[in-house]
């Protein structure tokens, strides 16, 4: 495979008080998980080119001593990587390798995006052995999760529905494009994130409807942000104002997503109580609908 040209490789230093090992030894609160994590983040774009998508960026925790699981994320309809880029930096700061990508066409539908997600998983696994890879020998190839926004979220569900054996968790946010679809074959823990006033993918026909079909996905969780629009879990600092979150809930959705990945990718059981124990009122008061099966 031909290598695409490198745009840049930088380290983004995250200022954290104390020694990193000390910070990660304790189970933080959901509120703390919602903030930037303890690891320094590096990212690069020198990745093998594949036919399923165009450009891609790999974020990873540069100073994490242990090996790490991987997360691949698809943007939504007529979106680019920049619309989900905050997830890459944020999740890497909490200890995960993350790939975001651009679809071949901005209007690619969910099945093509699902193919792209699967190809991205293969790429991330390949980085574990590729000469010149900055994460060579560091990726836990059997610990993969999929995420995505809008049609990318529907794609994450499609992949989980058809290829659950390839992943350990799925986190669709504001999934759209597959109205009233059935995802009963999903067999991995799935966190569904939605916005109460999503006008582009109304929850009763999309996210909430999808969640109700996840009869084989246990555990599963549905969190619907009160007053949230279609873009609540997307990057806030984008040029097109119409693609921005209408309220700032990054700490809320981020904290829940990190806890989900810590439990189901990393196998850290101490996070189970955070997710399925008594939820703090400062969390539940931000949700218009919250349900789970553990």
Protein language model features and the residues they cover:
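A conserved short beta-strand
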Residues: 165-175
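Bacterial N-terminal signal peptides
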Residues: 10-18
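Short amphipathic alpha-helix adjacent to the substrate-entry channel of hydrolases
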Residues: 82-102
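Short beta-strand element of the alpha/beta-hydrolase
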Residues: 67-76
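N-terminal cap/lid segment of alpha/beta-hydrolase-fold proteins
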Residues: 26-66
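Active-site-adjacent alpha-helix of alpha/beta-hydrolase-fold enzymes
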Residues: 186-188, 193-255, 259, 263
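Gly/Ser-rich "nucleophile elbow"/oxyanion-hole loop immediately N-terminal to the catalytic nucleophile
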Residues: 66, 111-154, 162
């Amino acid at each position: 495979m031909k290598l695409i040209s490198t745009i840049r490789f930088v380290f983004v230093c995250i200022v954290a008080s104390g020694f990193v090992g000390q910070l990660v030894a304790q189970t933080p609160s959901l509120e703390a998980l919602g903030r930037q994590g303890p690891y320094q983040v590096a990212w690069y774009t020198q990745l093998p080119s594949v036919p399923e998508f165009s450009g891609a960026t790999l974020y990873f925790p540069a100073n994490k001593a242990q090996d790490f699981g991987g997360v691949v994320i698809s943007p939504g309809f007529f979106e680019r990587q920049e619309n989900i880029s905050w997830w890459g930096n944020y999740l890497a700061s909490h200890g995960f390798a993350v790939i975001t990508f651009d679809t071949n066409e901005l209007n690619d539908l969910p099945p093509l995006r699902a193919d792209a997600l699967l190809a991205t998983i293969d790429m991330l696994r390949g980085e574990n052995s590729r000469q010149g890879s900055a994460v060579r020998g560091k990726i836990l190839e059997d610990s993969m999760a999929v995420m995505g926004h809008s049609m990318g979220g529907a794609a994450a569900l499609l992949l989980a529905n058809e290829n659950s054996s390839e992943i350990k968790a799925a986190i669709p946010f504001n999934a759209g494009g597959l109205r009233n679809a059935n995802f009963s074959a999903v067999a991995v823990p799935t966190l569904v994130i939605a916005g109460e006033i999503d006008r582009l993918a109304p929850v009763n026909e999309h996210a909430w409807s999808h969640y109700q079909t996840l009869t084989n996905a246990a555990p599963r969780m549905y969190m619907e942000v009160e007053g949230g629009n279609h873009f609540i879990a997307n990057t806030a600092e984008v040029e097109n104002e119409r693609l921005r979150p209408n309220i700032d809930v990054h700490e809320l959705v981020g904290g829940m997503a990190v806890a989900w990945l810590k439990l189901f990718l990393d196998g850290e059981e101490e996070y189970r109580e955070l997710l399925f124990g008594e939820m703090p009122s400062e969390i539940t008061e931000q949700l218009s609908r919250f349900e789970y099966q553990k």
